[in-house]
Amino acid sequence: MVLIAYCVNVILHMIIAELSYNNGGVQLVKSFEGELFHGKMKQIFSWSVFIVYGLAIMIGVSGNINGGAQIFVNWFGMPFVAAQVLYYVIAGVVVFIGMKAVGIAQKYAVIVLMGIVAVMTVGTFLHPLNSLQRAEFHWNNLLALYSMVVFATSANQAVIQVVKGLDGNAKQIRRSIFIGFGLSSVFVLIVTGTVLLGTKGALEKELAYMQLGESIGTWAMILAGVFSLFALLTTFSVSYTHLRAHETVLDL
């Protein structure tokens, strides 16, 4: 199922990359303007897509804030509302440092995340492992796994940035998409596998990686929290920068 999700994601993001490539590396809404929207209704359709896209990002960001707040609750035992405010203040720094600095920070954040996953994986296998139980086959479980993998590895706006960053080099764009989604899928398998193998007791927390950390030791719980925090902050900053980019191209 992970392989199917990988193939579907690659095909969909190849289409997005081609749309952006054919329209000079512009954002998604502008690509729709160049390929789909014409005539008197062009602006109405463009604004409609932007509004829907913006709402989707805002809903995602709200969930992101709740996830980030949960980390502070686990770390400091603070009230959830206060944790939400604290996370929002930290994440809001992106507004002040600018999109270029955000891009540079994301590069190093990804390196940190890869290092944490490597350490957590080693730590998992240094402790007694759970036996993987085989659940009864059901289509709903299969579809849930597919949806999770597709959601976790989706990167439609990152593909557009690849088109711009590689100056329209089609060969390198294709290679980046294949390799990028391959790495993302491997990460999903590693993180999911270590959580299932190393977590003691039933999975009860929303942030399963932190529960894995608790099962390994205090140091691992801290690392898992840092991993979750960095991952959520990266997602938050990406959501903001891409929404801001769409505002710019629409002259808002």
Predicted features by range, described:
Residues H242-A245, V249-L252:
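Single conserved hydrophobic/aromatic residue that forms the stacking wall/gate
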Residues V81-L86, I104-Q211:
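Helix-loop-helix junctions that connect adjacent transmembrane segments
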Residues Y6-I15, A91-F96:
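Central hydrophobic cores of alpha-helical transmembrane segments in multi-pass inner-membrane proteins
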Residues G67-N74, Y88-A109, G165:
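Membrane-water interface regions at transmembrane-helix termini and the short interhelical loops
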Residues L3, S48-I59, V89-I90, L143-V150, ...:
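Hydrophobic alpha-helical transmembrane segments of multi-pass membrane proteins
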Residues E206-R244:
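Oxyanion-binding "anion nests"
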